[in-house]
Amino acid sequence: MPQLDTTTWFITILSMLITLFILFQTKLLNYTYPLNALPISPNVTNHLTPWKMKWTKTYLPLSLPLQ
């Protein structure tokens, strides 16, 4: 059974990594970053819902008294 020839693996993997690095660098070079990095405060609105207007009690089946 012949052995697997791995002599070219190092140069193949190295060239692949260099190519990926160059591709990612060119992608990031074209990205425009925002100039002002100030946080934007969200507009919080309070919605009135019917279940907030009254007090309700939830009865669980296990908390009912024994019959």
From Swiss-Prot:
The modification N6-acetyllysine is found at K54, K57. It comes from the Eukaryota. It is a single-pass membrane protein. It holds the Pfam family ATP-synt_8. The chain crosses the membrane at residues 8-24. Keywords: Acetylation, ATP synthesis, CF(0), Hydrogen ion transport, Ion transport, Membrane, Mitochondrion, Transmembrane, Transmembrane helix, Transport. The modification N6-succinyllysine is found at K54. The keyword Transmembrane applies. It is found in: Mitochondrion membrane. PANTHER family: ATP SYNTHASE PROTEIN 8. Subunit 8, of the mitochondrial membrane ATP synthase complex (F(1)F(0) ATP synthase or Complex V) that produces ATP from ADP in the presence of a proton gradient across the membrane which is generated by electron transport complexes of the respiratory chain. ATP synthase complex consist of a soluble F(1) head domain - the catalytic core - and a membrane F(1) domain - the membrane proton channel. These two domains are linked by a central stalk rotating inside the F(1) region and a stationary peripheral stalk. Component of the ATP synthase complex composed at least of ATP5F1A/subunit alpha, ATP5F1B/subunit beta, ATP5MC1/subunit c (homooctomer), MT-ATP6/subunit a, MT-ATP8/subunit 8, ATP5ME/subunit e, ATP5MF/subunit f, ATP5MG/subunit g, ATP5MK/subunit k, ATP5MJ/subunit j, ATP5F1C/subunit gamma, ATP5F1D/subunit delta, ATP5F1E/subunit epsilon, ATP5PF/subunit F6, ATP5PB/subunit b, ATP5PD/subunit d, ATP5PO/subunit OSCP. Belongs to the ATPase protein 8 family. This is ATP synthase F(0) complex subunit 8. It comes from Dugong dugon. The gene is MT-ATP8.
